[in-house]
Amino acid sequence: MDKEAEPILQAMAKKKETKYCGKRVICGTLFGEKVAVVICGVGKVNAACGAQIAIDKLKATLILNLGVAGGLNAGVKVGEIYEISHAVQYDFDLTQLNGTEIGTLDECKTNYLPLTVCGKYPLKKLATGDRFNDSPADYALLTNILKADIRDMEGGAIAQVCMHAGVPCFEFKIISDLAGSGSTTEQYFSNLGLCFETLKRELKTIVAAGTVKD
């Protein structure tokens, strides 16, 4: 979303904006590194489109996915940042067709996709789906079955695109709301400012993850 990208855009220099497939793309430098920010929009299809634009049009050799997300257990805290080690799409289900676990893509043998990690932050498992809700059924699926720590609406789709393209993908999520602590919608809006302050503070470290040379 635009508001999630704003702290990043404020830190960029030599900015030049264009559009691909209706998505805002801002190229420039960030802490001395050439970067491009693709503002995807909400949801898995938007996220996949944005990742493919970065890879095909911008020739990205690495993807950094940044954003706020919901926490699912006591192992995460509001306003804190976490790195994603594995991501699954919890609303993708071929169980009835082939007996695979929920979230297992047709081209994969397991449901969680591994991501590239820098090890600068605590590692967590992410569940992605096109829903923002307080559904008890979703919560049971995410925690009891998938054992996820964090939920969002984009990360798993970006991981899938990067897997097929062979492009390393780092994902960093800042917790805006916690399941079981009242309305996640109210928490989300109340805690956005705190999340953006965390992003500003940690942005240089995050960008450094994508500039480490082998």
Model-derived regions, located:
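Short, conserved "active-site rim" segments that organize catalytic pockets and cofactor/ligand binding
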Residues: 1-12
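Nucleotide and nucleotide-moiety/phosphate-recognizing core
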Residues: 15
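Glycine-rich phosphate- or other oxyanion-binding loops that anchor nucleotides, phosphorylated ligands
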Residues: 20-214
